[in-house]
Structures are given as C-alpha cells and as structure tokens.
Amino acid sequence: MTKKERLLRAFQNQEVDKVPMGFWYHFSPDDDFGQKTVDQHLELFRETGMDMIKVMCDGYFNYPNPYIEKVTSAEDWFGLTPMGEDSPYIANQVLRAKRVVEGVKGECCVFYNVFCPMSLMRFGTSEELLMKHLKENPEAVCHAFEVIAEDVKTLVRKLITEAGCDGIYYCVQNAETFRFTAEEYRKLVRPSDLKVLEYANTLSENNILHCCGWAGDPNRIEVWQDYPAKAVNWAVYVENLSLAEGKKFFGGRCVMGGFDNRKEGLLYSGTKEEIEKEVERILKETGTTGVILGADCTVPSDIDHQRLIWIREKLDKM
C-alpha cells in the first residue's frame, strides 16, 4: 500500500496495512521564503518516512491588505475589499505549495495550512484591536471577515487546482471559552469559517479540519463539531478530549493526532520506550481504522527527528 493509498483509506475509515502518521513544525525560512523552505518540508518527509506532508504557511500569517493601515475606527472595516487574484500574498504561497507537490512526485498527499478569516485578521491587526472593534461594530468586522474569506477562497482554489494540493488543512481558532459564548461564536465567526471550508469541499473531498488550541486555552469545541471535513485534528491535551472520545464526538470521522505537541509532553521529552508504549496505548484505545497518528498541533522546531522515526518504526511493527 502506498503512502497516498494508506492515508486516503484512513480518511474513508477503511482498513489499512498500518496506521499512517503525520507531524509538522514551523520552519525558519530564508528571506524570500523560497526554495529553502520547500527543501525543509521535503527533508522532514524523507527523513522520517511520514505518510503525508502539511505545508506550513510560515511567512504568511499576517493578512497584508494595505487598507488595514487606514482603519482608525470599527466602522472603517466596511471599506475593506479583497486583495484579489494577483496578490503576491496568494501567488507566493501557491508557488511554495506547487514546489512541494512537484518535489514529492506523487509519493504522498500534500495539504496546505490555511487559517480561518478571523485569525488572519487578528494576525494582520492585533488581538486587542480586533476584539475592541468587534464589540463596537460587529457588523463592520463581520463584513471584514467575509472579505478576507474571499481572498482565502482564491488561495484555496489556486492551491488545489494550480499547485496540485490534495486538500487543505483548515485551522479554526478563536473559540476560547474566555472569548465568546457558543452562541456568539456561531453568530459572528461561523459564517466566514464555513464560507472557506464549504468552498474547499467543492474542490476536494479530502480536507482536514484543525481545531486549534494554540495558546493552551480550552475552546468551545462543540461549535466546530458539525464543520464538514474528511478528517479532524484537535488538541487532545488542551480540550481534554481523547482521540477515541473525539472520534465519537465528531461523528465517527477519521481522526488525527494523539500526542501532546508541547515540550513537556512524551513526544518531545519521553524515552523511546515511553513513546512506543504511548503509540500502543493510543491505538488500543482508538483502534486502527480511521486514525492518523500525529500531535495536537505543530511540534517544537528543535525536536529530534529520531523521535518521529521511533513512532514510524513502531507502527511498521504493529
């Protein structure tokens, strides 16, 4: 069974010859975010023998719409318009993804990391400004979310149809319990979240939903429970929702993860024996069908690749 076949069968909750795995971290790109970054992705894949590549959007977190500099009040967000098809922000990410796809030569599935519109707006402004304006004029800020979603849709289309990605790894955030009630999130954020994800699903049936627990704050994860995606990844150790429990919670869909991604976790700090036992524990609890072994989120950039190889070797033996 090829890596691609293995992963796609896991997506479909079909039997596989062994459980697939996928891990990633933030790279240190060169100044132009060019070929060096592409090579880093391919080197990680080749060295560890993983079953998939998730291309990081390092260097493109901020949404660089020049209009943002003109915003001085919440009402100003009504003037935001999309950057459009020819934006370097979009073109350069598509080029990175295309080079990774070409470099892997069909050996595995490639997914590109795409953030939800609210997160891109938060990266492009600030936490404080976004939440302040959202309280002052939610309609204006929600208009901005919708505009950003149009640019993200353009990015998604080009990633899949031009770069050749198999799908996207869609990162949703901002549902922390301190930020919104579930009702508020569904009213303010859900529409733009789904505008992107549902569009991605018209282009590829193999998209991954990442329910991000990036800062260690629990989310109202129920707001994402019905988001349509082939596989789901969330922060097991932040949400206190095991891989087995999450598989039921997300309706029996393929689940991805299992390991704590933080430095205090077994993956980064444990012994080989401890990591191997954790692989056994996770799969005994969750099963081996519709499961992709990974982590809660990005792992530390200085992780010893040998630790990921231990996992792959253990899976080879099971």
In which residue ranges do the predicted regions lie?
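Active-site loop segments of alpha/beta catalytic cores
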Residues: 1-31, 36-40, 51, 55, ...
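Alpha/beta catalytic barrel-like cores
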Residues: 24-30, 51-83
